[in-house]
Amino acid sequence: MINDQGRRRIRARQPEIDRRLRSPRPDGRRGLTLLGRLPAHVSRNIEFTLQQLAAVAPEQYYYSSPDLHITVMDLLAARDDLRLSAKQLARYRAAVGKIVATIPPIHWRLQGMIVSPGAVLVTGDYGPELAELRRRLRSELPALHLPVAERYPTVSGHVTVARFTHPISAPDRFLAAIKENATTNYGHFTMHALDLVVHDWYNRQVESCVRLPFVGDGR
């Protein structure tokens, strides 16, 4: 289980270090991602927990509220050499938007916090619409000669809230804070639209963004 693996690595002071976050150079990788934004009350609740973690391990990287998101699918995983023409991007927008427009809004409950070997995650429960959306994207986009190149097939729904940039100096205290929030309820919400973005690995630099509504949403 990912949480057990993460806890073992942290106890051994051997987390997976994200060295790009330690570089003064901006992240040059770009990817095409379909993601969901968090409502303000959920982001605020997560930030309260991140303040608690930062008090124990200030040397790590913690996502700011605007950067928090749920990755629905990495259509083209972020890499250094990704280049999309305006025509290619328009084709993805049209095709993905058409699929999203047939899917009902997705209901979410974010509750609990776990660690992977390289990150801290807030876990989510969600409606069956998410799996159906992913299935259709994986089958219908390639049929339209629009490649799908995921880093790995996304099957869960979570929010990455922190990444490790250094060994954790107080692993027991850090893991205690994670355990304290293992059942924390960060909030319920309904996702009425998704964003199709070209962005860097950490969602700090967004170069292109279009909002795609679910079926029946007039927002």
Language-model segments: residues:
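Histidine-dependent nucleotide/RNA phosphoesterase domain, centered on the 2H-phosphoesterase fold
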Residues: 1-219
